[in-house]
């Protein structure tokens, strides 16, 4: 064997990929909310369900609350609205509990990344936004307007 026979040269290949980001003006509030909930889920900053959300709101740990409009328990709606008003936490209402459950990660993803077996969710509170993003800025801007 030669002196260099066992050594293999390693070549690093670096590819630059340009990704076109959507302009903040073209992102709707609903899309921004979906992105913020996804980032909060990754950073373990979501309180899912009425029990966890009401605890987070009562402790004033919640930065944002999302409530389902079609919640059949009127007492739940009054409780969440009162806790949000007391702590001055922004409240967003969503029409479908299945959509909110999908955004909050209460589903199983198939091989293609499509949500299956989605569980409905009545309330979600964001306790940690995770990293700063354009979607978060758009959402916070919509609250101040």
Swiss-Prot record:
Q: What is the lineage of its organism?
A: Eukaryota, Fungi, Dikarya, Ascomycota, Taphrinomycotina
| Assembly notes | Component of the small ribosomal subunit (SSU). Mature yeast ribosomes consist of a small (40S) and a large (60S) subunit. The 40S small subunit contains 1 molecule of ribosomal RNA (18S rRNA) and at least 33 different proteins. The large 60S subunit contains 3 rRNA molecules (25S, 5.8S and 5S rRNA) and at least 46 different proteins.
Q: Which domain of life does the UniProt lineage start with?
A: Eukaryota
GO terms classed as biological process: cytoplasmic translation; maintenance of translational fidelity; ribosomal small subunit biogenesis
**Encoding gene, per UniProt annotation:** rps1201
What is the species listed in this Swiss-Prot or TrEMBL entry? Schizosaccharomyces pombe (strain 972 / ATCC 24843) (Fission yeast)
What is the protein name for this chain? Small ribosomal subunit protein eS12A
Mention one GO molecular function: structural constituent of ribosome
The protein's location, in the record's own words, is:
Cytoplasm
Annotated InterPro entries: Ribosomal_eL30-like_sf, Ribosomal_eL8/eL30/eS12/Gad45, Ribosomal_eS12, Ribosomal_eS12_CS
List GO terms (cellular component aspect).
cytosolic small ribosomal subunit
């Amino acid at each position: 064997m030669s002196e260099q026979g066992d050594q293999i040269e390693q070549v690093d290949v670096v590819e630059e990929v340009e990704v076109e980001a959507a302009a903040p003006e073209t992102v709707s509030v609903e899309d921004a909310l979906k992105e913020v909930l996804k980032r909060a889920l990754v950073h373990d900053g979501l309180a899912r369900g009425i029990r966890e959300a009401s605890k987070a709101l009562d402790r004033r740990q919640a930065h944002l609350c999302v409530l389902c409009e079609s919640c059949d328990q009127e007492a739940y709606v009054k409780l969440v609205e009162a806790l949000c008003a007391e702590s001055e936490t922004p409240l967003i209402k969503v029409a479908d509990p299945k959509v909110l459950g999908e955004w909050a990660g209460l589903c199983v993803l198939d091989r293609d990344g499509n949500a299956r077996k989605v569980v409905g969710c009545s309330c979600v509170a964001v306790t940690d936004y995770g990293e700063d993003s354009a979607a978060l800025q758009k959402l916070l801007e919509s609250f101040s307007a």
